[in-house]
Structure formats: C-alpha cells, structure tokens
Regions:
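Asp-based phosphoryl-transfer active-site loop
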Residues: 5-22, 99, 231
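Active-site phosphate-binding/coordination module
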Residues: 26-127
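Residue-level signal for inorganic ion chemistry
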Residues: 35, 46, 73, 156, ...
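Short active-site oxyanion
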Residues: 39-43, 65-67, 155, 216-217, ...
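Conserved acidic, metal-coordinating active-site core of Asp-based
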Residues: 102, 106-221, 225, 230-233
C-alpha cells in the first residue's frame, strides 16, 4: 500500500485546469484520473456557479473518487459524490435593494445566479450572455431585480465596460461595506459582491477541517489574484506559467501555462513521479503459475513492480532447438508472460485487461 504525501489537489478552473479553448487537455485529464486512482481527491475551486462546474466534475469523475466542488469563489462547497452541501455562506437579502440602487446610479448591469439560471436586469449585456453560455445557464430578465430575487444569493455581480467606474465603486464599497460584504474585481468588467470573509482559502480551510487533512497534505494550483490565498495555504502552492508576477511570487513552484499542460506537468512531478515502485511478492506469483504454460516452460518471475517486470527461463529440452537456439514459441511465451503481468500491475481496479500478443 502506497502512503501518499498529498491527499488533496485543489484546482482553479479558468486559466488553470482549462486551456484557452475552455477544454481539459488529454494529458491533463489522464494525469488527474491517475492521481485520483492513486487516492488523491480533487477540489475544483472556482468563481463559477456550482451548476457551471458540474460538467467538469463529471469529466474528471469526481463523483467516483470522492471529489469536491468549491464554487462562487468559496461561498459553497459540495460533495461531488452525493451533492451534500458541506459549507455555504450567502448574502443577506436585505442588502439587495442597496446593491441595485448603486448599480442603477452608476449605469451598471446587475445579475446573480440561481440553480441553472442567471437573474438579471440586463439580459442583452454581452458579458452576461457570455457568462450564461460558459456555464450553460438560462437568462431570466427581471427589471425589478431586488424584488424578484426572493432568496439569499451566494454572490452578485455588477457589470460594466467602464473599468475606472468599477474601480471607484470597489474602493468606495471596501470602506463602506467593511464587515458586511466583500467586493473584488475578477475581470476588468466584473465587480463581485460576496459575503464577508469569503475567499477560496477560508472555505478550503473549512473543508480541510471537515476531512481532517493537514495543510501540508494539500497541493493548490491557480493563475489569478483570487487564487493567491489558497496557493499560500497549501503545503505546495503552484502558480501557472502565465500568471502575473504577484501570483508567482506567492507560489512554491511555477509550472507551465494552461496552454502547455501546466497542471499535468505539476501533478506528474509532485505526485505521480514521487510514488516509488513497490515490489510485489514473487512466491505467490510463481506458485500460481506452476501449472500454466509459464510453469511448464520453467519461467520464473524474479522482479515485479510498476516500473518493470523481470523473469528467467531455462534453456533445456522444453525451450531449445538444435544447437541450443531458443525456440521461437518459447521466446514468445516469455514475452507474453512478462507483458501480461506488467499490464495487470498497471491496471486500475475499474479497468479491464484484454488479451494481447507481444513479439
């Protein structure tokens, strides 16, 4: 049994897990499935809504391996296996009329998320439409926003192409709303409003406590300013190669960019390559094969592990031709025996090995 140094792998999504085409590369997918098979659990940590992360969680098979979704920049954590909410913080609905008033005064669009929908007063806004498309959400128009939102949202978003105006409101709210709500810009055109003291690291800390996992047993990978706190929290904090210098300086290690399989490279180096091949006891293997073809030919395993398989075969009346040359059939039997065991060693519990020929 392999003792894993790391138990939790926390991944930002956009700009980290996904390439610029918003896809998980084949190499990254293979690496992430591999580490889950090795016992490492994955957390998707994103500003996206929970619904928007579900397809990615399915692609990574988080439900099969006990992974988690940390959504809305930390406002909610759910167990991908059973949908149980493990952590949640929401905005007090009494704050919504104030947010709506400020948005209208500044000419900003306003929206929030609810299940598989976006509720907004500006359905034609290009950025809101892109957000809906990215997360596969329906847009519901509500001209009286605060009256229509009759629930406590995880977060609200103000939208404008006037970045200077957004910065001005952000600075004002950081003073005015201190202790009530937190605000930050996730994009030049987005100003996010979330419950106080919510970020990826604080929510991740709650998950670590729930799972009884130490910080030293966590790897966190991200590319943005919103990822800095979780990168600093983790035992191994990794910044993507295209990150700003302010992010890279906070990391223990800088990997390649999201266009160059940066997540796969980091995971292969930090987790997969660190697992040493463990020898498999040979006595049982050789005993089981005594009455099979390999036993009849005198083949004996001398070493078996994930890195290689070795076996010996005597040159005698069973395996040789005249003048001591090995019989082709015996050589093939030796090759098939070694390759077959190697395939079974590498096979995961949910995989099936089919017949093969090796020459």
């Amino acid at each position: 049994r392999v003792i894993m140094k790391y138990k939790l792998l926390v991944l930002d999504v956009d700009g980290t897990l996904l390439n610029d085409a918003k896809e998980i590369s084949k190499r990254t997918l293979a690496a992430l499935l591999k580490v889950q098979q090795m016992g490492v659990r994955i957390v998707l940590a994103s500003g996206r809504p929970t619904y928007g992360l579900m397809p990615l969680a399915k692609s990574l098979e988080l439900g099969n391996y006990g992974g988690f979704i940390l959504s809305y920049n930390g406002c909610q954590i759910i167990n991908a296996q059973n949908g149980e909410i493990l952590f949640e913080r929401r905005i007090n609905p009494e704050m919504l009329p104030y947010l709506e008033k400020k948005a209208r005064k500044n000419g900003f669009a306003l929206f929030t998320y609810h299940d598989d929908t976006i509720i907004t007063d500006s359905p034609e806004n290009e950025h809101i439409q892109n957000e809906a498309r990215l997360n596969n959400l329906r847009i519901i128009e509500e001209t009286e926003f605060s009256a229509a939102v009759d629930f406590a949202p995880c977060k609200c978003m103000l939208v404008s192409d006037n970045e200077e105006a957004l910065i001005g409101l952000e600075d004002h709210w950081k003073r005015r709303l201190n202790g009530a709500l937190d605000v930050f810009r996730s994009e030049p055109y987005f100003l996010e409003v979330v419950p106080c003291a919510i970020d990826k690291a604080n929510s991740l800390g709650a998950l670590l406590e729930e799972l009884d996992v130490k910080r030293e047993e966590v790897i966190a990978i991200g590319d943005g300013v919103c990822d800095v706190t979780m990168i600093q929290l983790a035992g191994l904090g990794v910044a993507m190669g295209h990150s700003q210098d302010s992010v890279k300086i906070c990391a223990d290690y800088v990997t390649a960019s999201n266009e160059e399989d940066g997540v796969a490279i980091a995971v292969e180096k930090a987790i997969i390559a660190e697992v040493r091949a463990a020898e498999i006891p040979l006595d049982q293997l050789n005993a089981q094969a005594r009455h099979a073809l390999m036993g009849n030919l005198g083949i004996q395993y001398t070493y078996a592990a994930e890195d290689r398989v070795e076996a010996t075969m005597p040159v005698d009346h069973r395996t040789r031709q005249p003048f001591g040359i090995l019989h082709g059939g015996a050589s093939l039997a030796l090759a098939e025996t070694v390759a077959g065991l190697g395939s079974m060693i590498l096979c995961q519990p949910d995989e099936i090995v089919v017949g093969m020929q090796v020459s």
